[in-house]
C-alpha cells in the first residue's frame, strides 16, 4: 500500500484529521476533527490530476451532478472543523462530503460531471459569509468594502448620508423603504432594512413592516422612551419581526431598570451592549444577562486596546451631531466611554455572554473590519486568559467555533434568516468565503455569493496569468447583470410578502422572508448563551459577573494589523 508523509499530503490535498492550522498571525490554532474525503480517492483538478473524463468526472447529465464543487476544503463553522468537498447546486449548498465519480470511486455523495466547475479548496479555510447586523446605510460604497472583507449580508437602516442615517440605523416610512428595496437590486449583497421604531402608537410602525422592513430600530436620538419600547415590541410581536435597540445614554426617560421593565420579557437585540456605542450610562451592559436579550457588540471597542478610549471621543462627537463647544455635549460623549466596561466586554465575549459582533458602519464602526476585529478579540483573550474550558493546549477549536458564530449563525438566528443563510450547511444559500490560512480573517481569496464568485483578489487583467501585481479586490461576474440578482437575497417581512411588495416594486433579487424572530432567545445563541448576573459599580464602573470582577489589560500590540496593511 502506497503511503506519503503528512507534510506531502497536506501540500497536495490540504490538512487532514489531526493536523493543526494557525489562523493568520494570531496565537489561535484549529485542528481538523474529521476528514470526509477518502484517502487514495481524493479528487483534485488540474493537468494529470483526478477530475478528468472517466476518472473523477462522471458521464452523468447536469440534473444529476453539481454545478460547482469546492475540493478538499477545511470548513470552520459553529458545528465543526472538518475537511470535506462541498457541492453546490442551483446556488445552494447541496452536499458536504466526498466528491467524485461513483462509477469508479466508492462512497461518493457529491457527483462531478461535465456540467460541474471546480474551485480548488486544498489548503484553504472555508467559512460562511459574514452577517453584519448593525449597518448605517450611509453610502453604497460600504457594500464593496464589506464584501471584500468576507461579509455577504448587511442588516440595518438608512437612506444615504442624511443626518438621521449618520446617527441611526433607520429607514423611516414606506416611501424611503421602497426606494432602498429598489436600490438593493444593484448590489451583490444580501440586504435587510430596519424601519424606525420610535413611536408610542402602532400604526406608523406597522405600515413600515408591511412596506418591507424586516424589523424596527429604537434609537435614543429619536427618543427611546419606555412607551416607545413597549409599543415597538408590541408591533414586532404581531408581525414576527425583530427589534434592535440603542437605549437612553442620558437616562432622561428612565434608567436601565425602566428599559428592562418595558421589554416585558420580549425578545430584543441590544446593539453595542457594553455602552460605548450608546446606551444607559454606565450599566446598560447588565442587559447581557437577560434571557430575552440578544446582545451584540460593535467593532470600535473590539478588542480593548491602549487607543480605544481616545479614538471614541472624536468619533462620537461627529456621529451624534454633537458640538465640542457645548459642555453638555462633551459630558454626554465622555459618559459613554468607560475603560472598565470595555475591558469587561472582552471577557464576556470570551465566555459567551455577548453573542454577536457587528460594525456600526461609518457611525463609530468600520464596515470592513467585523471579521478581523472578532478574531483579534479571540487572540487577545487567548493570550490573556489562556485556553478555554473544553480546549486542550494543542488547539483552540471551541474558541474558534464560538467566535465564528458571533458574525455568522447568531445574527442569522437573531434576525430570522437562519433558514436561508448563516452557516456552511446543506440547503442554505451558498454564501461562502475562501481564505488562505496566513491571511485568515484579514484578506479572503474568494467571496462566493449564491454559488457564484462575486469578488476576488485579482491581478492585472492584461497580464498573461491571473496573479501579477497589482493584485486587489475586483468584482467578478457574479456581481454583474442578472447573475447578481439570481445569487443575492433581499430580506423582507411576511407582512410585506403578503402585501405583494416584491411585485409592486418589481424587485429582481431573490426574496427571503424573515421568521422566528419572536421565539428566538439567548439560549438559542449558539455557543454564546451564557446568562451571568451582571453588576456595574456606579462610581468605579467595575463590572462583576456572578460576583466575579471582570477586568483585563488593554492590548498594546495586535495581530492581523500592520503586518498586512500599509495604512
From Swiss-Prot:
Belongs to the metallo-dependent hydrolases superfamily. Urease alpha subunit family. The gene is ureC. The keyword Cytoplasm applies. SUPFAM superfamilies: Composite domain of metallo-dependent hydrolases, Metallo-dependent hydrolases. Ni(2+) 2 binds at residues 217, 246, 272. Binds 2 nickel ions per subunit. It catalyses: urea + 2 H2O + H(+) = hydrogencarbonate + 2 NH4(+). It is found in: Cytoplasm. This is Urease subunit alpha.
Amino acid at each position: 500500500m502506497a503511503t506519503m508523509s503528512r507534510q506531502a499530503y497536506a501540500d497536495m490535498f490540504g490538512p487532514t484529521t489531526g493536523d493543526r492550522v494557525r489562523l493568520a498571525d494570531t496565537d489561535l490554532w484549529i485542528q481538523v476533527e474529521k476528514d470526509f474525503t477518502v484517502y487514495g480517492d481524493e479528487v483534485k483538478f488540474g493537468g494529470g490530476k483526478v477530475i478528468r473524463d472517466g476518472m473523477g468526472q462522471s458521464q452523468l447529465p447536469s440534473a444529476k451532478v453539481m454545478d460547482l464543487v469546492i475540493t478538499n476544503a477545511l470548513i470552520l463553522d459553529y458545528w465543526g472543523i472538518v475537511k470535506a468537498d462541498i457541492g453546490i447546486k442551483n446556488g445552494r449548498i447541496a452536499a458536504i462530503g466526498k466528491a467524485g465519480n461513483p462509477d469508479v470511486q466508492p462512497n461518493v455523495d457529491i457527483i462531478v460531471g461535465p456540467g460541474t466547475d471546480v474551485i480548488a479548496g486544498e489548503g484553504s479555510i472555508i467559512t460562511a459569509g459574514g452577517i453584519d447586523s448593525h449597518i448605517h446605510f450611509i453610502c453604497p460604497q460600504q457594500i464593496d468594502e464589506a464584501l471584500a472583507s468576507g461579509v455577504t449580508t448587511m442588516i440595518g437602516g438608512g437612506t444615504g448620508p442624511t443626518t438621521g442615517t449618520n446617527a441611526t440605523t433607520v429607514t423611516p416610512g414606506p416611501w424611503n423603504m421602497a426606494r432602498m428595496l429598489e436600490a438593493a437590486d444593484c448590489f451583490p449583497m444580501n440586504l435587510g432594512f430596519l424601519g424606525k421604531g420610535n413611536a408610542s402608537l402602532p400604526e406608523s410602525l406597522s405600515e413600515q413592516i408591511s412596506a418591507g422592513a424586516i424589523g424596527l430600530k429604537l434609537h435614543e436620538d429619536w427618543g427611546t422612551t419606555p412607551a416607545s419600547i413597549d409599543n415597538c415590541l408590541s408591533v414586532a410581536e404581531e408581525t414576527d419581526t425583530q427589534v434592535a435597540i440603542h437605549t437612553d445614554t442620558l437616562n432622561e426617560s428612565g434608567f436601565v431598570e425602566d428599559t428592562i421593565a418595558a421589554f416585558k420579557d420580549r425578545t430584543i437585540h441590544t446593539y453595542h451592549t457594553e455602552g460605548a456605542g450608546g446606551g444607559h450610562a454606565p450599566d446598560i451592559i447588565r442587559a447581557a444577562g437577560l434571557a430575552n436579550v440578544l446582545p451584540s457588540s460593535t467593532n470600535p471597542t473590539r478588542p480593548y486596546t491602549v487607543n480605544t478610549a481616545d479614538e471614541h471621543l472624536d468619533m462620537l462627537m461627529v456621529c451624534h451631531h454633537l458640538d465640542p463647544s457645548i459642555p453638555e455635549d462633551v459630558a454626554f460623549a465622555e459618559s459613554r466611554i468607560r475603560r472598565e466596561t470595555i475591558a469587561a466586554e472582552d471577557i464576556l465575549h470570551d465566555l459567551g455572554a455577548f453573542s454577536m459582533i457587528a460594525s456600526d458602519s461609518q457611525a463609530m464602526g468600520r464596515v470592513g473590519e467585523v471579521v478581523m476585529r472578532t478574531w483579534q478579540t479571540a487572540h487577545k483573550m487567548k493570550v490573556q486568559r489562556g485556553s478555554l474550558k473544553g480546549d486542550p493546549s494543542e488547539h483552540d477549536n471551541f474558541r474558534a467555533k464560538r467566535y465564528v458564530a458571533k458574525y455568522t449563525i447568531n445574527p442569522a438566528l437573531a434576525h430570522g434568516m437562519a433558514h436561508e443563510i448563516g452557516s456552511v450547511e446543506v440547503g442554505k444559500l451558498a454564501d461562502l468565503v475562501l481564505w488562505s490560512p496566513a491571511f485568515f480573517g484579514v484578506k479572503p481569496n474568494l467571496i462566493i455569493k449564491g454559488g457564484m464568485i462575486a469578488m476576488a483578489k485579482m491581478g492585472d487583467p492584461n497580464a498573461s496569468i491571473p496573479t501579477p501585481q497589482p493584485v486587489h479586490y475586483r468584482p467578478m461576474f457574479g456581481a454583474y447583470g442578472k447573475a447578481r440578482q439570481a445569487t443575492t437575497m433581499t430580506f423582507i417581512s411576511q407582512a410585506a410578502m403578503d402585501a405583494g411588495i416584491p411585485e409592486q416594486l418589481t424587485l429582481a433579487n431573490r426574496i427571503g422572508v424573515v421568521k422566528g424572530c419572536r421565539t428566538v432567545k439567548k439560549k438559542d445563541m449558539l455557543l454564546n448563551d451564557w446568562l451571568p448576573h451582571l453588576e456595574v459599580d456606579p462610581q468605579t464602573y467595575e463590572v462583576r459577573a456572578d460576583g466575579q470582577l471582570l477586568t483585563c489589560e488593554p492590548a498594546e500590540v495586535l495581530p492581523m494589523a500592520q503586518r498586512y496593511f500599509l495604512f
